[in-house]
């Protein structure tokens, strides 16, 4: 049989274990919450690495001629002298002079093996391979 003093000591140890466990659980929850918020980003506060771009929205549809139309919204954090562009069919930061002068093919927008041609009105470019042609028109 245990003495009242031993019972009080056991209760105290048990209580301190529960308090410690609750504290560890709270710390873990805060760390997990902070890391998931960092991955998701805060609306309006999300920072991306300088010199990179990320797609924030994609839109896709077909017109009446069964031609697929795609558009995307991109968020970039470019270095000074750079602007949002396209390299190897992915959003990227490119030299501003390429965009200003509309030398679209100088940013290498097409995939490996595709030919790049600037559209006649300089509004974008086309990438072609065999009988497949992808046309990109720049909008701001």
From Swiss-Prot:
The keyword Transcription does not apply. It is found in: Secreted. Keywords: Secreted, Signal. GO terms for molecular function: receptor ligand activity. GO terms for biological process: macrophage chemotaxis; phagocytosis; regulation of signaling receptor activity; superoxide anion generation. The keyword Signal applies. Residues 1-35 form the signal peptide. GO terms for cellular component: extracellular space. InterPro entries: Chemokine-like_TAFA, TAFA_chemokine-like. Belongs to the TAFA family. Modulates injury-induced and chemical pain hypersensitivity. Ligand of FPR1, can chemoattract macrophages, promote phagocytosis and increase ROS release. This is Chemokine-like protein TAFA-4. It comes from Macaca fascicularis (Crab-eating macaque).
């Amino acid at each position: 049989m245990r003495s009242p003093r031993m019972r009080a000591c056991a209760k105290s140890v048990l209580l301190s274990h529960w308090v410690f466990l609750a504290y560890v659980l709270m710390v873990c929850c805060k760390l997990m919450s902070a890391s998931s918020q960092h991955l998701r980003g805060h609306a309006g506060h999300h920072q991306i690495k300088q010199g990179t771009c990320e797609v924030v929205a994609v839109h896709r549809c077909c017109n009446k001629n069964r031609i697929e139309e795609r558009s995307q919204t991109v968020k970039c954090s470019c270095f000074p002298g750079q602007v949002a562009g396209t390299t190897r069919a992915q959003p990227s930061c490119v030299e501003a002079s390429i965009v200003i002068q509309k030398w679209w093919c100088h940013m290498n927008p097409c995939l490996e093996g595709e030919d790049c041609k600037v559209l006649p009105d300089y509004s974008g470019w086309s990438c072609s391979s065999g009988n497949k042609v992808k046309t990109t028109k720049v909008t701001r």
